[in-house]
Amino acid sequence: MMQICDTYNQKHSLFNAMNRFIGAVNNMDQTVMVPSLLRDVPLSEPEIDEVSVEVGGSGGCLEERTTPAPSPGSANESFFAPSRDMYSHYVLLKSIRNDIEWGVLHQPSSPPAGSEESTWKPKDILVGLSHLESADAGEEDLEQQFHYHLRGLHTVLSKLTRKANILTNRYKQEIGFSNWGH
């Protein structure tokens, strides 16, 4: 009985969620031989945004369907909005995989003037987060904060994994090899 429960919890662990995502991105990377073919090809899969992940008190993760997300163009539009092409998704998914595997690399201290990087500073996000954390630290229990962020991480990893799998399958359809690997 104990082994069955442990196996169930392991199936829904953070490590397994990360491994599923990394595996899906590796599969995508091996399948997509010519990434430039992904440019200007829209990726619209609305069912991706209908998934939420619940993390139980013991840390177990359960996936369930919820109501559809807001329509594209709304204030809640994300990076994975249908207006982006498959190439943008491909680059982002590979970048996130690298961040998980190797850690977040530090940006150069002085990017070239006029570049897109010159307007964005990683410490800006950290300052905003530290302000929120200090305000919540006295009010919320650390365990509740942990479960909140764990739930969010599971949700994001689940959506990213599905997005990588969908991109792989769409690429196969676009080049005419829809039955590869099946």
UniProtKB/Swiss-Prot annotation:
One Pfam family of this chain: Spot_14
GO MF terms held by the record: enzyme activator activity; identical protein binding; ligase regulator activity
Alphabetical list of InterPro entries matching this protein: Lipogen_MT_Stabilize_sf, Spot_14
Tissue specificity annotation: During embryonic development, expressed mainly in the neuroepithelial midline, urogenital apparatus and digits. Detected in adult white fat, liver, heart, brain and kidney. Expressed at very low levels in lactating mammary gland.
Subcellular locations according to the entry: Nucleus; Cytoplasm; Cytoplasm, Cytoskeleton
Residue positions where Phosphoserine is found in the record: 71, 74, 78
Region entry Disordered, spans: 55-75
Superkingdom of the source species: Eukaryota
Keyword entries, A-Z: Acetylation, Cytoplasm, Cytoskeleton, Lipid biosynthesis, Lipid metabolism, Microtubule, Nucleus, Phosphoprotein
Induction entry: Down-regulated by fasting. Up-regulated by a carbohydrate-rich diet.
Keyword hit for Lipid biosynthesis: yes
GO biological process, one term: positive regulation of fatty acid biosynthetic process
Primary subcellular site in the record, as a coarse category: nucleus
Gene Ontology terms: cellular component: cytoplasm; cytosol; microtubule; microtubule cytoskeleton; nucleus; protein-containing complex
N-acetylmethionine sites (modified residues): 1
Record carries keyword Cytoplasm: yes
PANTHER family: MID1-INTERACTING PROTEIN 1 (PTHR14315:SF16), SPOT14 FAMILY MEMBER (PTHR14315)
Family per similarity comment: Belongs to the SPOT14 family.
Role according to the record: Plays a role in the regulation of lipogenesis in liver. Up-regulates ACACA enzyme activity. Required for efficient lipid biosynthesis, including triacylglycerol, diacylglycerol and phospholipid. Involved in stabilization of microtubules.
Identification of the protein by name: Mid1-interacting protein 1
Species in which this protein is naturally found: Mus musculus (Mouse)
UniProt lineage: Eukaryota, Metazoa, Chordata, Craniata, Vertebrata
